[in-house]
């Protein structure tokens, strides 16, 4: 195969070029170099190039590398003496001025470059296609469909097997696993094709197909898409030869480069081939020897098929990562090896680094193989648990010796962070982690651990359960034993009821913090109480604190996104702990950024490099007998779901063995200077990747067997085979004898660092608040704890307001007299009134539809039909003097603005210093502007005195106005209220909502303050949006609609005021003055 020359001729227009890389050969550098050349030489501008890779981190790295290469080229063009590599020296030879101009233009417009993951690229294209693609702009892209799949399995399992008396052919856990695997492998044929109709295979196949069909229906119905749907939809849009999508994509991107192409899948290649093959310059860069993501959909057969049809195929021939001595040793073992087939072969590469950069190590051979021996003549295998203990201790001793030896790498002392331990399984990784920590060697490992299964998640659950019922001693003691409090069984017993009561009081206090400032405030309070210092003093404390902080963030984000209170968060956390999801945020985070040995799986290590790499268990691989088998049939990716089938099992094992051979290649090639591996006679040693490479084949043989033969072998015979590789230039064979372990001295702390001291005074007057927040801040009552709703309920209504004013008008029964009270009911009514169309031909049906939709968030024990019927009369109730002759039914959506969300600064918002007002100043404005006979004039006294009056108006005010109605040229504010104003046990009637009684309710609930703030919001909004705005002309006052008193056209009217409709028109000058006051201007 021809070796690729970055300085050679650029790929010809409208051709496909495959660049086959090897580990460490700099494919990202080659790709960035090609981009720089295309731009510098005027072949294309940066926005005419599409760069695709297969992961977010990879796409970000690629973007940074491309930009850095363009910057470096510009530096060289400005000063040729600063050219740092062959590419830059090539670019400065000719046409410097034009090349400089082109690269500067590219840098200036770099944000226009399309450097994206496959899914991001599909999203961009589908959005731009409009009707040319099967894409709805209103759909939501979700990271995981696991919850939806679980829901479908629940329903279909009941439908398929619920009526059976005998045990079903498919258990529920099997059904759930089957569904998730099938959904996770799109563009895969399900097998067997035609099973016997009554066979178990037919049952499983039908269930799988039904899941896929139902998933499509529910995704459409709910307006959601998974990432794989993006690919499928784009592939469908590109299928016709004359597809407008093809034309647009070819015109936009005449040059396309795909990185990590070995990880492609059939649909991804279908998209790329249909859009660009033969029409754009297509460069595919990948290394089939590193195709290790079959379990994520990566399909090596697709890569090989694409590579076979490419017009030009070249290889990257220089290893920029590893020392020559290591490259030579690895090539002695890997040269010519077929890693899954004759088209996936290890080719020789040349090493860029000719020397050996690791100096002074106790054992400085670049490739070492440590062999665990048995007694002479013994062929019995060693149990893997015993090997994990032995190899873990041997690993720790070897690393300890290296770190204490004074060895250097690139003239710098070897540190723990220069060492990686790479395994295939998390169980092996955990064993290594424990062994290193036991030996006093700093090590970090994140693993596949789900943070929801961690001790931190469990402690958060105990805490949330105690928040809900702080009066139950058992729950309080369980919370006390968590990391948040740190109590033990002994301390709880000794502290007795007094300690339990103190913890309960703290729980109530923390619950108050959560309500005011979110869940993160609980974590902060616990930190201030000493949790961090206590937990970090424990062994593994960094891991625990990292998980606690991670869980806090997830809970905070969920509470903010979903509107959950503490009780809803408790239920959500229980669900998350019982179901494993696919979201990346579930993965535990690195617990320390200190210099430490990095322990990781092979998949995580891909793309990384380390001076020294340890492979303690590459010799061993457990091969399960899966009931769901991925395999290829004549190049077609298939998933066998029909149960046991010997032929399919053999095909699956063969492909799995090829994957494992490639895993071993990836692991071996992470090292820059030294690889240390082990071999031991375990039960699963015949399946191990390293064993099959070295025991399963002799030097010079290409085929790597799927399993070593014979499966059991004596130490003498094993050593004979392994030493043949040593003689051929491979690893140095060492006996695995555990040496002494010396503690690794900690890294010296920098002497020129000191904790910064905080001297500034915190402005306690600044806050982000709301009308309700201003009232809560003035409350002196202690914080109580109760079960909270799943979504934040309205907190500006009172279930039962004590009123003493006599009822007025006729006793027309309230349509809502027998409906529930409470915040959830009020929130449901508000949500329905915000979204229902009053112009609907059948208003009752319209209301019922919206009641059903909103009841998912606001579950209330009320029949839909009953509530819908009760809400119709309010739409026919006269709205009084502010909207003369009108009802809500007569004001359509074009003349109403629902849910006017707002947030505006008070006293300059974030500006430091300066004057600011208090609520008592608002009271003075009311005295100045409200006439004495105004029904709410007495509210000035309430604002001017007491704790409420001293509340500062500084920071940001946020909230939402229920609705604004356009009535002629005026704009009227509307706020819906579901308050119960009845007295005694009598039937609720319109008379309970006369004007005098509503005035009482307004004053009792501080609604005048809410009305004034909303008036300022409307004043500012109209000043921004309405041309020729005049407050006196356009401000139309405030309507507080007490919906329980609105009884329809027959609603009693007293002195021009209908029952249930409170009208108030504060003077426009008052609103303008208040707006200025909130800005800290002189009114």
Curated annotation (Swiss-Prot):
Positions annotated to bind Mg(2+): 830, 962, 975
The keyword 4Fe-4S is assigned to this record: no
Entry superkingdom: Bacteria
Active-site residues, Swiss-Prot/TrEMBL: 975
Effect of gene knockout: Unlike E.coli, triple recB-recC-recD deletion is no more sensitive to DNA damaging agents (UV light sensitivity, mitomycin C, methyl methanesulphonate or ionizing radiation) than wild-type; has reduced resistance to H(2)O(2) which is exacerbated by further adnA-adnB deletion. Triple mutants have no effect on homologous recombination or on NHEJ of blunt-end, 5'- or 3'-overhang DSBs or on incompatible 3'-chromosomal overhangs. However the triple mutant disrupts all single-strand annealing repair of DSB.
Catalytic function, reaction form: Exonucleolytic cleavage (in the presence of ATP) in either 5'- to 3'- or 3'- to 5'-direction to yield 5'-phosphooligonucleotides; Couples ATP hydrolysis with the unwinding of duplex DNA by translocating in the 3'-5' direction; ATP + H2O = ADP + phosphate + H(+)
Molecular function terms from GO: 3'-5' DNA helicase activity; ATP binding; ATP hydrolysis activity; DNA binding; exodeoxyribonuclease V activity; magnesium ion binding
UniProt domain comment: The N-terminal DNA-binding domain is a ssDNA-dependent ATPase and has ATP-dependent 3'-5' helicase function. This domain interacts with RecC. The C-terminal domain has nuclease activity and interacts with RecD. It interacts with RecA, facilitating its loading onto ssDNA.
Oligomeric and partner information: Heterotrimer of RecB, RecC and RecD. All subunits contribute to DNA-binding. Interacts with RecA.
Protein's name in the database: RecBCD enzyme subunit RecB
Species classification: Bacteria, Bacillati, Actinomycetota, Actinomycetes, Mycobacteriales
